[in-house]
């Protein structure tokens, strides 16, 4: 894949999360014929290999060519997984439209030649080449020579073009062309037929290997265990297929309503028509009525306004107001023109329009942006259908270990062939014995053993109200070493209590008006702002909306109504929202206030603005938002000089502070024509709204538990920086002895380059710091003692963006100690999580779903505290809306990881014990009988495999993690040491039994009554007690090796069953302990009981009691040595840490490398300094390593 023909290679979705490499290939008839012949002569093995390795299928059938000539494309993901897939290039024929619309090859099919659709149509035959990848269509752009996504309006369109080109709808001809090329507007998730699920599961390499093993066992008349494996496989496959089928049905029900909605579509010539939503295409003009409607596509609002419930996307059921896209004479793309807040104009698929307000034309109109799987809901569904692979390192290690076992089996096969060929055995017997070695050395149950711990952990989590849609991520939970938390609704309570209002005038701030006293708020602009500056709606007689807005409005004791119901005021449009004072409100000179227009709140802008009309009075604009943002839009002389210190008083106590401002407008301006920039300027500052947002009771103890376990905790919030710092201190995320350093970065302005400054936050000394974005207390100096303490960096989303753009080399150094990230937008939250992952942290993200969906999806482990549909994108959802689920999840993850490794070690040892025993017996051209194999495989190993994993998670989080890799020194040493120990014991038993005075190769007798008499034990081969069926297996070597191997399997299970510090002690697993006791008792009973019939069944020989005691002694010594080695060496963390230090081993994790390289620089952090992006030294700074997390990554 290193050399490509010209035009053969390209990138699909370049720069996006689902970026892929695409390679062009052309099918060759001769290659196809050869592969068909190979499939026949290999009895279907070749197609199976091609199924497992898609790239091999393409390389075998096709030759490389340019993408333009390709009929097959090979796709490879650009992430670390490098997953291959292939797709056939298909043709879409538009020739059918010739007769319907009279199209000619030269006829422009679209009104603009720049549209992708025009460039994708091959003329004169009117055909389109396309591929379908993960439910998305990509068409070949002949002009640019690349595959491009179709099903969306082009991003380059400006707002003026959207209004002009699509404001009147599409012609019928354009609709039909787009329908053919873009496909139907459906999110089809078919309920996968059971037979398909069954075939897919059966073709798993694990089950193919089992099929091979079963066939071999049937040929050897080893029917009992073959049937047992078949039954277990059927149960396993049935459960898996059932789970997959249930998930498929649930997902189908989740999206099926989307495909059967009737909508009103306006055509350019056809007028308004009622159509099925499945026929919608990008560019269609939707007409929204006042009725509730579920959006079947993504659409941009161009006229009127809507109130939308976006709970499915955000996890939050607070209605959101959408405003029309302004028509501006500019060629700038509409998303760029709207900046980060373009979503305020977009109605997303799957959201519910609960209220549509018409504009002057009397209609609410929206242009379809995206259809089908290109929509927001389609993207969410695709993330479920095609999840990002997890725990790849563990899977890769498992494959490597299996390959080692295969290598061992190969050596055993060569040994077997040599022994049996030299012995003159028949060829078919030699082959059968050689193949037996594979099923012994590579046990069919090995892959399943790795998942059993996960299954039990999932059940325990379910009992705690934690639900999981991606069970494989439970193991990843055991590796978490950094957890990010949203603040509002996650660390703090959902509800906000209005504590008071601080108004201001020319003399500065007035006394706090407390609502606890029950006194009504005096009339004035501040009262009017509280009554009208919100996004509340009246739905079925109930006021609904953001809790903050609701608390603020309720404090005024005003009422809400529609203008069309009780009021008929000139200049107020029909059905405008009107607020009016009630009887209990203070004396008000106006009859009411009509809300004419809203500029909705967004987390990116951190403010909202409304235009209102006092009935019989002035037209006003009110703004509400983050204090620092609102103050920046006000006339400087109206902002009190004590603004910073006043704000500090409340934010340092953890209050949430909102600022209010207003201005008068001219009555002759139409409210909807005014731009946001015009309205939001030269405002008059009104005061501060103080709301209380208390910590949840569970927050502090949970964070203390995580920190004591050396798991980093990070806060990512959209709230004020000072409030975030206060919450971090109150919650224990930042202790009293630790310092907080503010990092502030500013964009390039004029001639000055981007800058970054570092300041120590001081809680005791109050000094004014007048920057608009951050109002916190600082101090100028840091004592030497302070420098030696722990530091936590705090910064805003704006600073994070500037650092990412202009100081990227400093970003990893800042993240080493970055703890508080405030004013973060949803996109910045996702980016921050990704940056932590680049430093090799295992990142967890816990949020309530509101604005956290991207970060929840990006993290290794996303934990949603919301039960909305958005939680579908998160692997874990907690029914209990607090962060107590986080330590529970980590504990269960650690337990599941340790359990998986324990089972892996046990299954590997069990196979090696049996492997060693069989190869020793092969030396004597002997083996174990079917019943002997059955007893070991079914009665011992299967029962242990089922019960060994029942240990629960240890209730305490320890300050280190379990090993995250199968190929780790302690685990490898444990496996190799125990294999060698068992090998030594088996060889010793094998040799010693042959040197006993009573030993004879001619003994084939069952037990005698007086077996102490050697003479009675030594019988002739022709003795009547001899049984023909036993002549192949019965020998003293067989008896000795079988007892040693069988009981060794039991003792190894006890040695490998781990308890503290990650799992409950073994003695608490009562079922497992009982199984071991019964198994050991049965084995000892068989060993010492003289029951001829039992011995005949198991093909065993009686031996003197002294030899039986010798077997027990050998097993006891083996158990004691193994247990001591496991506890004193393998599980001795202190010893391994000392060995690491002696050999100078250092972690290769990126963040550990940063810590080692930058830990001892006395100049870090550069306090009271400002660096600029054009200064060379700013990119070569050094970082401070936080001693709190110094040994966070140490693991065995």
Curated annotation (Swiss-Prot):
GO MF annotation: an example: ATPase-coupled monoatomic cation transmembrane transporter activity
Regulation: induction: Decreased by half in the SLI patient lymphoblasts.
Q: Which InterPro entries match?
A: ATPase_P-typ_cation-transptr_N, ATPase_P-typ_cyto_dom_N, ATPase_P-typ_P_site, ATPase_P-typ_TM_dom_sf, ATPase_P-typ_transduc_dom_A_sf, HAD-like_sf, HAD_sf, P-type_TPase_V
Q: At the top level of its lineage, which domain of life is listed?
A: Eukaryota
Q: Does the keyword Membrane apply?
A: yes
What Enzyme Commission number does this protein have?
Answer: 7.2.2.-
Kindly state which keywords UniProt assigns to this record, in alphabetical order. ATP-binding, Chromosomal rearrangement, Endosome, Magnesium, Membrane, Metal-binding, Nucleotide-binding, Translocase, Transmembrane, Transmembrane helix
UniProt binding sites for Mg(2+): 848, 852
Which tissues is it found in, per the record? Expressed in heart, placenta, liver, skeletal muscles, and pancreas. Lower levels of expression are also detected in brain, lung and kidney. Weakly expressed in the adult brain. Expression in fetal brain is higher than in adult brain, with levels similar to several other fetal tissues including spleen and skeletal muscle. In adult brain expressed at low levels in all tissues examined, including the temporal lobe and putamen. Highly expressed in the respiratory and integumentary systems.
Indicate whether Transferase appears among the record's keywords. Answer: no
Membrane topology, as annotated: Multi-pass membrane protein
Q: Where is the active site?
A: 486 (4-aspartylphosphate intermediate)
Where does the UniProt entry say this protein principally localizes? membrane
Please provide, in alphabetical order, the Gene Ontology terms of the cellular component aspect for this entry: early endosome membrane; endoplasmic reticulum membrane; late endosome membrane; plasma membrane; recycling endosome membrane
Q: Which family does it belong to?
A: Belongs to the cation transport ATPase (P-type) (TC 3.A.3) family. Type V subfamily.
Q: Which disease is it linked to?
A: A chromosomal aberration involving ATP13A4 is found in 2 patients with specific language impairment (SLI) disorders. Paracentric inversion inv(3)(q25;q29). The inversion produces a disruption of the protein.
Q: Could you identify this protein by its name?
A: Probable cation-transporting ATPase 13A4
* Organism of provenance: Homo sapiens
